[in-house]
UniProtKB/Swiss-Prot annotation:
One of its GO terms (biological process) is DNA recombination. The keyword Disulfide bond does not apply. Belongs to the RecR family. SMART domains: HhH1 (SM00278), TOPRIM (SM00493). It comes from Deinococcus geothermalis (strain DSM 11300 / CIP 105573 / AG-3a). This is Recombination protein RecR. May play a role in DNA repair. It seems to be involved in an RecBC-independent recombinational process of DNA repair. It may act with RecF and RecO. Keywords: DNA damage, DNA recombination, DNA repair, Metal-binding, Zinc, Zinc-finger. Residues 189-222 are annotated as: Disordered. A zinc finger (C4-type) spans 57-72. GO terms for molecular function: DNA binding; zinc ion binding. InterPro entries: DNA_Rcmb_RecR, Hlx-hairpin-Hlx_DNA-bd_motif, Rcmb_RecR, Rcmb_RecR_Znf, TOPRIM_dom, TOPRIM_RecR.
Length: 222
């Protein structure tokens, strides 16, 4: 038995959603078919309204319906620290922990060469002008292979800018995504973050060859 074309199309579109395979898409399609028409229209309206009203914050690239997101617009936030995350959902998860009062930067993904996701596909370039000498940057990407690779790439970019770079780690399972962690675990992960670099120190003053060999420097000739 073949499904009607409209049902096939619905299953196909649902299966394009993250985490939804063909079987789950089929179950969702049958579920939606059984719902009252007004419920389906309300769902469709909510999707269209969100698509119309939401956009990314021009500063941190979190999702907002205002000119700038709530965090970037809040003058009481700690301006000396930026927490870098993969997705907007990670911001919500960290905010629920109540352990962080700094700023954010959302990359909208992680480096994944196998899937064709390079640095140019992420919001990495806009992060660099935000980082000032002596600021702390918390790399709160996931503990997946892609998240670790992204953190290492960012560390190498940020160290020459004089940033104190730290990595969220404690309490997060390997391969875990931040948005699925509970508030207590995230709070401990933020509190237990470890520094992976320090601000670059200026090079020592150069000495002439004789001083370097241990011989006293010659007095200046007249």
């Amino acid at each position: 038995m073949k499904y009607p074309p409209s049902l096939v199309g619905l299953i196909r579109e649902l299966s394009r959603l993250p985490g939804i395979g063909p079987k789950s898409a089929q179950r969702l399609a049958f579920y939606l078919f059984e719902q009252p028409r007004e419920d389906i229209e309300r769902l469709a309206g909510a999707i269209l309204e969100a698509k119309r009203d939401l956009h990314t914050c021009p500063v941190c690239f979190n999702i907002t319906d205002a000119e700038r997101c709530d965090v970037c617009s809040d003058p009481t936030r700690d301006q000396s620290v930026i927490c870098v995350v993969e997705e907007p959902g990670d911001v919500i998860a960290i905010e629920r922990s109540g352990e962080y009062r700094g700023l954010y930067h959302v990359l909208h993904g992680a480096l994944s060469p196998m899937n064709g996701v390079g640095p140019d596909r992420l919001q990495i370039r806009p992060l660099l002008p935000r980082v000032q000498d002596g600021m702390e940057v918390i790399l709160a990407t996931g503990t997946t292979v892609e998240g670790d690779a992204t953190a290492l790439y960012l560390q190498r970019l940020l160290e020459p800018l004089g940033a104190v770079v730290s990595r969220i780690a404690y309490g997060l399972p390997v391969g875990g995504a931040l948005e699925y962690a509970d508030e207590v675990t995230l709070g401990r992960a933020l509190s237990g973050r470890r520094r992976v670099s320090e601000p670059a120190s200026p090079p020592p003053p150069r000495r002439n060859d004789e001083e370097q060999d241990g011989a006293p420097a010659r007095p200046p000739s007249h």
